[in-house]
Amino acid sequence: MQTAEPDIKAMNAMGYEATVLGNHEFDNPLQILDMQEKWANFPFLSANVINTKTGKTLVKPYTILNKQDLKIAVVGLTTEDTAKLGNPEYLHNVKFEDPTTVAKATLKELNEKVKPDVKIALTHMGYYYDAKHGSNAPGDVSLTRNLDKGAFDMIIGGHSHDPICVDDKGVWIKDYQPTQPCKPDFQNGTWIMQAFEWGKYVGRADFEFKNGELKLVNYQLIPVNLKKKVKKADGKTEYVNYAEEIPQDPEMEKLLKSYQDKGDALLSQKVGKLNGKLEGDRTIIRFEQTNLGHLIAEAQR
């Protein structure tokens, strides 16, 4: 509704230093993406999304961050599935190249020209445990396995909406619960991390760089006021935080209040009537036909 303006303004306030193009950046005309880039105080990245008119990347392929005398290269990579997930009306002059092939070429350029101390892939490709991606385009695990060992020090990913936590044996904890101790996946010398979806967690990874080597010291998925239902002694139930409550930031609230009010006004407009529930649960609608799917298909005919 608001072309991600409040999202980007909030990301500016939080100090984001980079973001990667995902499939939803191509739901709208590219002019919207241009406008979003202007709003942002940080670069939009993707090394494998090509503007076929110019033959160049649509946005910056990578950025270099300088932290405590370290050169940190951050490379953006986007799922090839965007070609079928994005709005075809806006993809005429856009090509999505193979992320692995592009990563190899980009790393070669970085290693020769920049010589970074740390190399990070910021991806929107998805996490598919043991590279079992099914009908989806290959994700982060496939990427690491098809590159040289440790080609990237770490991958910070998205797209599949997963909390990446593995146990001591390296097995993915599918039913991860907030505050449960865990560590990121480690594939072919590369740490793979993802902090679930929709701001439910803040992902934190602490690394130590010493004598040219990077070592993971700590990894956390910090729940943002997520609650669980507990039964009290009197038999009644209540919802309590999994972890210490994170207080609302008054400056952020002030920044976003007008956008919230505008969104509420748009969402409160009556557009029709329902006689029953529209089934949109992800675990159902992505695997079988539902009345919501039928409604959307009819609307698009």
Language model regions located:
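Acidic, metal/ion-coordinating pockets
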Residues: M1-N225, F287, L292-A299
